[in-house]
């Protein structure tokens, strides 16, 4: 049986079910769990069930009362998820509010709030002042946003705990960092650093405790 395409350009709702392509340029509400090959949101979506798709693109606004799962996720608009985002490849350039992000590769260049934890193979962050409780990954890169001659005054992202294989960070505040290899720029402040491999540290006077194991 062929899957149905759904397009909402005015105001409407989508019932529980399996779909091929879902396009929303108006105002839409889902009335249950939906699965789809593609979900594209340039309007407004209120999902009252879980959403699972091979590809999700949000350039408008979307709120999800349950988990949202996508093979490929691209956000240039606004997304609010009550619990968890699961993705293969996630590029978050808009505004995202959620508790947990899980993925293979997660890139955040926008605004992220309410996030307790990011778990991924790779994490790439290009953000300013943000608080995230925990990062867990093989590879982590943290870049400060470009801001001309004044980028040094940017408030850096803050983390309670980072656990990874290797990390390269231009600037951050972290209570506990455990890794194998690290490359830490001069705008990093760390309370406790534990590493077992190679360390390039430009901010030694801003690290309270260093433990090479």
Question: For the regions a protein language model found, what residue spans apply to each?
Answer:
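Extended beta-solenoid/beta-helix repeat architectures
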Residues: 1-213
């Amino acid at each position: 049986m062929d899957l149905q395409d759904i397009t909402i350009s005015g105001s409407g709702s989508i019932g529980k079910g399996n779909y091929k392509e879902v396009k929303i340029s108006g105002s839409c509400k889902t009335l249950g769990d939906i699965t789809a090959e593609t979900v594209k949101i340039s309007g407004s979506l209120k999902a009252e069930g879980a959403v699972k798709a091979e590809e999700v693109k949000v350039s408008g606004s979307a709120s999800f009362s349950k988990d949202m799962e996508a093979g490929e996720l691209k956000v240039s608009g606004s997304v609010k998820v009550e619990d968890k985002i699961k993705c293969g490849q996630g590029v978050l350039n808009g505004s995202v509010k959620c508790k947990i992000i899980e993925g293979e590769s997660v890139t955040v260049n926008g605004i992220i709030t309410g996030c307790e934890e990011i778990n991924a193979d790779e994490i790439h962050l290009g953000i300013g002042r943000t608080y995230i409780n925990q990062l867990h990954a093989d590879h982590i890169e943290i870049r400060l946003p470009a801001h001309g001659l004044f980028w040094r005054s940017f408030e850096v992202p803050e983390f309670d705990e980072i656990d990874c294989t290797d990390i390269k960070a231009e600037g951050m505040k972290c209570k506990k960092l455990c890794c194998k290899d690290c490359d830490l720029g001069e705008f990093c402040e760390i309370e406790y650093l534990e590493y077992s491999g190679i360390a390039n540290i430009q901010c030694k006077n801003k690290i309270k405790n260093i433990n090479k194991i």
